[in-house]
């Protein structure tokens, strides 16, 4: 059989049906697409007019107009851009997925492409009009052609179209949508303005709509005011007004934007009445080019911990709004950041509603993350004397300096930020390996030296005692529980500072942070305490002798508590308390196990180690007591209570205590 090369065939009517009914998830996007096409047409004329000024004819001011006729049930989008000849209308409107804008971009030089604000690229946006219209009529005349060479194109979206020559004095294009009965909402001035404000507020061209004003109805009985009136209505005045900003604050040079304007823009995009703590506005130049304006809020939203809630910055492509929560452009642990990212390089799906993973997306994500961390490092430096921030990696994209108020105004802001978002920032230790060191420098904790969450790891390390070999910390449910934990007693005695960690995320996060600047982090509630050079030989010898002398008692305790404790041993960490619970060095703490169970997740069934203070009177009283079993269980349950836990059988605990009291 001979080999053949054949072309794919398409059922045009079915293809149009798919484009108009399956491609777009949001019906109102049709207006964004048609306004973007109109903007492209004006931009094409702007470029063509550089060499042929006569193309502007007698209307050099480029604009887009949106109007509607409730009686005729039509919605019209008109531009005075480049327009189309009859042949161009047949080629561009009669061929699905043929992008005139993409063809035009291919004819521009490199510098012209940089300056162009052309939006379209797929050649299907026009057909989104059929989402709301059962017929579309296009009237157009190409700039430079006589008025007699206008063209009218019309189609019902069923696979065929009609074309005829018309007289059209004005250059440019009018797209007339004959709306379906179900699309009556788009014959409403307020509705159209809200869509334009959402999607096309920042394109560089003015978008005009006819003004409306309220007009009272006629008197039911002429001359009789008391007889009532017919219902009033909004009526058109004949004057046109600009309904978009026609500029993008983030596209302006930073020197031309005041702090007040930055703050006001933040309130507009975030719906937050409070001013932001700080912001960064920069244009990144490199393999991927984009502009970003990122804000750090002053207050956490009520749903910050709702993992199902979408969060992220607003994404624009060439000033056209694409999506509200572009989660792919910032990691989850920075979900509190608000702002705008605008790029021409991002790969979108055909409907321009979804962002596709690519090298450019990853580059923007990495650059935006570094920018946010730089803002936080800047706040931290001004908040107090802190360790210097890491320098940008060699070859990183060039970014401008952070734009913010003067240095004096930054004092205290990092403490304010950390009180609101510190716990979220800790999630980054497990999510962002590349920036783990920078994140570690931004962490703040309370300690045995300060009840305020103001101690950084660098600060702690700078004041470690001579001979101290680890950064010590303890996790607990509350600050009070951490401060009064029995495990801290030997550290307090020796004047060793211990970090107090009370956020739910702490223990999970520290699974990913094992050392800081070469110094290991060690929980005082895990494993055996080895203070190394901080413990003198006499103390070590006394501990060894006590362990040997108490072997029979320890064996008896272990047998009695075999269902509760994995092991029983003499402690070196207690001074005043009779006992405490610890876990093996690589084990899950009882606190983390409790948190997992409270969250409805499975936690491994593990038993803690009971450590007893050989010098405590209660422990010494155990040997020979007729209430040995009851005292052993009470000792264990009290140790559990001291670290914020509850006895497995509270009633049995109370019964044992009562029995000893009488």
Curated annotation (Swiss-Prot):
Q: Cross-referenced Gene3D superfamilies, in alphabetical order?
A: 3.30.230.80, 3.40.50.11260, Heat shock protein 90, C-terminal domain, Histidine kinase-like ATPase, C-terminal domain
Query: Pfam families of this UniProt entry?
Result: HATPase_c_3 (PF13589), HSP90 (PF00183)
Task: Show the segment(s) annotated as A.
Answer: 1-352
Query: Where does it mainly reside?
Result: cytoplasm
Which keywords belong to this entry?
A: ATP-binding, Chaperone, Cytoplasm, Nucleotide-binding, Stress response
Q: Which GO terms describe its molecular function?
A: ATP binding; ATP hydrolysis activity; ATP-dependent protein folding chaperone; unfolded protein binding
Q: Look up keyword Nucleotide-binding and say if it applies.
A: yes
Which stretches of sequence are listed as region Disordered?
382-402
Give Gene Ontology CC terms.
cytoplasm
Q: Where is this region: B?
A: 353-594
Q: Where in the cell is it found?
A: Cytoplasm
Write out the ranges of the annotated region (C).
595-662
Quaternary state and interactors: Homodimer.
Per the record, the similarity remark reads: Belongs to the heat shock protein 90 family.
Q: What does this protein do?
A: Molecular chaperone. Has ATPase activity.
How is this protein named in the record? Chaperone protein HtpG
Lineage of this protein's species? Bacteria, Pseudomonadati, Pseudomonadota, Betaproteobacteria, Burkholderiales
